[in-house]
């Protein structure tokens, strides 16, 4: 009898059959850029299912067992039909999505995927220079971005159509090796301006140059011989042809 062993005792015949056995393996894979955001679980649990019903207790996968496990000595068939084995991860890992690939014959792989969190750094540029009174303001400036003290990017910034100076560094990693990255910005030196950085906003200040204008009243009248000299006169200062301030009095 195929697949059976036969033992004859006198006139009695005994046929024996050993049900087939199988094994099922599972491996845990992490797709998270080497745990960049530090969210990876230290351990997960996996449940084996036989024809949709839980088989045994969940098993733990972790670094100690290389995130892999094999169920051995499993029955191949039940009620004359081949058993379909599947696996599922117990619960969820916060911040991850889970996919299961493979089969009982080749082994299952449970992949947890996390896309590292991204951020943008935005800032504004303001000028404190009396509306560029002295014509010193440049047409463009350079802003440099640093990640934990190391330069990561730079950007040339100009005024937009409304005259506003803004910049943005996008698609930046929020974490590195599980620790939040500290981003800072600097500005290349702007001649004659001082720079103050507040967070990601940059303010450049320039003190317009100052000058002075003097006037002296002289009398050419032979020392007021005829007594016509005025006791006081007034003088008006002009800037580019327009009166500047009030007239001032000159007298003895």
Model regions and ranges:
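Solvent-exposed loop/turn and edge beta-strand elements of beta-rich ligand-binding domains
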Residues: 1-252
């Amino acid at each position: 009898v195929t697949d059976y062993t036969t033992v004859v005792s006198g006139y009695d015949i005994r046929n024996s059959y050993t049900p087939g056995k199988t094994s099922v393996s599972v491996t845990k894979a992490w797709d998270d850029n080497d745990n960049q955001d530090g969210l990876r679980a230290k351990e997960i649990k996996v449940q084996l299912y036989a024809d949709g019903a839980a088989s045994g207790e969940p098993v733990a996968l972790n670094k100690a067992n290389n995130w892999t496990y094999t169920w051995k000595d499993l029955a191949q068939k039940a009620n004359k039909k081949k058993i379909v084995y599947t696996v599922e991860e117990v619960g969820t890992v916060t911040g991850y999505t889970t996919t299961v690939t493979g089969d009982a014959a080749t082994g299952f792989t449970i992949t947890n995927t996390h896309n590292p969190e991204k951020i943008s750094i935005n800032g504004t540029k303001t000028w404190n220079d009396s509306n560029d009174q002295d014509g010193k303001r440049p047409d463009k400036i350079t802003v440099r971005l640093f990640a934990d003290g190391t330069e990561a990017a730079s950007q040339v910034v100009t005024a937009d159509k409304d005259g506003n100076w803004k910049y943005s560094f996008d698609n930046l990693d929020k974490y590195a090796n599980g620790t939040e990255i500290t981003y800072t910005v600097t500005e290349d030196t702007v001649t004659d301006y001082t720079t103050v950085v507040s967070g990601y906003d940059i303010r450049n200040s320039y003190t317009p140059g100052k000058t002075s204008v003097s006037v002296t009243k002289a009398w050419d009248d032979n020392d007021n011989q005829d007594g016509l000299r005025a006791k006081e006169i007034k003088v008006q200062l002009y800037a580019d042809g327009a009166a500047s301030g009030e007239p001032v009095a000159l007298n003895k």
